[in-house]
Amino acid sequence: MKTLLFAILPLVSLYFILLVEDGRADPYYRKFTTPKQKALILGNSKAGQGIMPSILNNSLKQIYDLKIYNYSFTLFGSPYGPLYLESVKKKLEEGIKGSYFIITVDSWSISGPIENPNNISIFEENKLFLADVKLVDIDPNPFYFASHYNKSFYEILIQKIKPGKTKLHDDGWWETEDYLDSATILSRKNNMVRFYNDYNERHSFSEVRFNYLREIILLLKERGDVFLIRMPLSDEILEIENEAIQEFNKLLDGLASETGVQYKDFNENKTSFFFEDGLHLDTKSSIFFSNDLAKWISDFKSETDYKFN
């Protein structure tokens, strides 16, 4: 009996520790414990940090009577491909109609390893969490913690007692600490420039990923409005992205026309945004951008309603 008790006690303790994780100990875990959703934001970390569902929900509540959830991850974790498609399917509620979806795209989210960019078996995400997390709406979620939680479990308790400055919110938005020191910001930007120059040398456009992007668009279009967007970048990082896929906007304009959805590049006539590292918007700019995005969607819906009335 004592042996059984000692065997069960650690599991029970772990169960309750996982229940108190509130988004501060890990940037992705809570995305796999929240319920299935009616509306989603898709993309990588730019979208994860830069688009605030709370602002969209408030600004668009007269148009869409539902809440949108940020289901964006990372450059390597959620490029468009079979794993992201299947995870999105799992995260969607059944029978959704009259919803809306925001799909963020950049050159890197539709690129693959340069040796064979269309070979699914060598896609980087095969070794990351989307490959292992079979259920995306259970709390606690052992599929994620078994393979992809790399910190001590005590970190969960520490963050609960003394919270840090980063947090994954209940709506999927990843809040980060704003770096105000100019030297730190410059250093981070230089690191990003080096990283993405190197990334471009090792990756190229993937027709397979592009086709999966199309498949995701068509999947979501059956459930509501789809808005395809290119998020703003600093001039330095944007120049590198433009080198990755030339005539990117022409490619996306064609896809939007083919699938019957709206596309906008927010780098065109962009207002003055502040980037933590050249890539990710800081909190204040995330607020500004989310409002800009909401206005664009609202204006489109108003124009569409006017045409049909």
Regions found by a protein language model. Give the residues of each.
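Alpha-helical transmembrane signal-anchor/signal-peptide segments
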Residues: E21-A39
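Hydrophobic membrane-insertion alpha-helices, especially the h-region
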Residues: K2-L19
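Membrane-embedded segments
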Residues: K46-I138
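Secreted/periplasmic serine-hydrolase-like ester/acetyl group-modifying domain
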Residues: N118-I216, E222-R223
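Catalytic nucleophile-elbow at a beta strand-turn-alpha helix junction centered on a G-D-S/GDSL motif
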Residues: Q37-P53, T283
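C-terminal regions of proteins
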Residues: E241-N309
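Active-site segments of SGNH/GDSL-like serine hydrolases
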Residues: Y179, I216-E241
